[in-house]
Amino acid sequence: MLAMASVEELWAKLDGAADCKSLLKNNLTKERYEALKDKKTKFGGTLADCIRSGCLNLDSGVGIYACDPDAYTVFADVLDAVIKEYHKVPELKHPEPEMGDLDKLNFGDLDPSGEYIVSTRVRVGRSHDSYGFPPVLTKQERLKMEEDTKAAFEKFSGELAGKYFPLEGMSKEDQKQMTEDHFLFKDDDRFLRDAGGYNDWCSGRGIFFNTAKNFLVWVNEEDHLRLISMQKGGDLAAVYKRLVVAINTMTASGLSFAKRDGLGYLTFCPSNLGTALRASVHMKIPNLAASPEFKSFCDNLNIQARGIHGEHTESVGGVYDLSNKRRLGLTEYQAVEEMRVGVEACLAKEKELAAAKK
């Protein structure tokens, strides 16, 4: 039963997997393993907690999670190497957070005609600095964290005011409605499961959303908090402002979020840290998507294009999810700006290709 395997058993499985191409396999050398295998974080986390999922799922892309915020210090030898490779940065020099001046944003509605952009969404991940991540969290700690979070939700006012729905004991009607709204999160990811992400499911987990349903927070899904602002159309400014006001409100309520110098905001998976921000649009680009240069066009703009139902899904009706690729090494405002520039370039190219067909 490898689910409870020792660090030695996990290492043996990883070390013997010649075909494994994960970042964990690439960066956890024998020397690093020997230096880290007996260390513990202040939350009681171990190397085994960090690498379990990547050793059980040898087809992982990343293969390593941080067991808690302190893991980024205690296991920095391997985590820093993984972070540099994943985020394609030579050194870890993430700037201080900078959301920009909300009264002087460099963007507004990216598609006033409403012809191309179906919807716009910006989300961030945040972690409480006083709690561990899923592998080390007890059920009691998760429930206490949920209470701390709910107290912060009470501070939301105006358009952010809403209601919190715990997953545990949720009525069938609420479940059905949230599934239809695409708000509900599930426990069906094997990588996350083996990392401890679904321990004590579904206790201490829930969803907050405002009355207009254009702002929501996932509590204890993968990260402690995922704050999501979204709406139909292309008004990036409105979506971004709503999110920033929500983040500032939660911080002002007394919540303290985990950060580390050079890494920015810390998340369970090292692929999300830094700004921990993903800004995206669902956009109709059938002509651009059909062109052979589509991928390189997006790559040159630091834009990730994927199907509207998430990673590794196909487009539906020429609609693609376009988002900022970079999370680390730039400010929040710069990340959103980079997405804005990329989306506008895709929009211009789509119009040009459509006109050429006439």
Swiss-Prot record:
Top-level division of the source organism's lineage: Eukaryota
Catalytic reaction equation(s): L-arginine + ATP = N(omega)-phospho-L-arginine + ADP + H(+)
Subunit field text: Monomer.
Family, as annotated: Belongs to the ATP:guanido phosphotransferase family.
Domain Phosphagen kinase C-terminal: 116-353
Species this protein is from: Haliotis madaka
Name listed for the protein in its UniProt record: Arginine kinase
Keyword Lipid biosynthesis in record: no
Keyword Transferase: yes
